[in-house]
Amino acid sequence: MSAIDGNFVYQKTLSCGRIEVSSEVTDYPLTDLFDIAERRNPKRAFLFVSKVLGRHIPVSPLVMRNVYTQLAEKFPGTLDGPVVFIGMAETAVGLGAGVFDEVRKHHPDCVYLTSTRHPVDAELLCEFKEEHSHATDHLIYYPVCAGMRQTVAEAQTLVLVDDEATTGKTFLNLLAALRASGALRKVRRVIAVTLTDWSGEALYQNCPLPLHTVSLISGSWRWTPE
């Protein structure tokens, strides 16, 4: 890792190309938060692997809880409620639950949903695509509990949680599907939460609602195929 023009730069060469990641000055060295792995996927040959998520690499629960707390502390001081959190399957289901758990200490009027790739016998809220994934289709179902369903219907703040945002396209696809479903008509603001955000200005430029982003680090990436 090196520093160039005030940015931190991390480079890695894979068998099919080279990726360069840069971020603004941060409390976290880039290599403390993630590494880059190669994968057999023609849509995207590389994968950001988190070192603090606790999914692909074993992580102390204390480290994970500290991450949830730090992300929650970056939320706006006031949230218009109710609040709906959505964690992305499969990687961010635990991350979303952890951030939700921390935020609801101060904003109890909220509910947590997750996407899934598995059809279940329940009422479908919406479906959307994670286009770069090996398994593109995501489903979100309504809660069974009547009180939670009412929270969803009345929600004014929508929180979307994923482990990382590479282009921001998945968040935008989900938001479009939710708006098309008519289920969250009262939402006024979106909060996009990630451990690492490489999407640049894409979310701000394309989000149809006021947006606040939360991440431990943000920056950009460049892929050079070989």
What are these regions (language model features)?
Residues 1-226:
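PRPP-associated nucleotide enzymes
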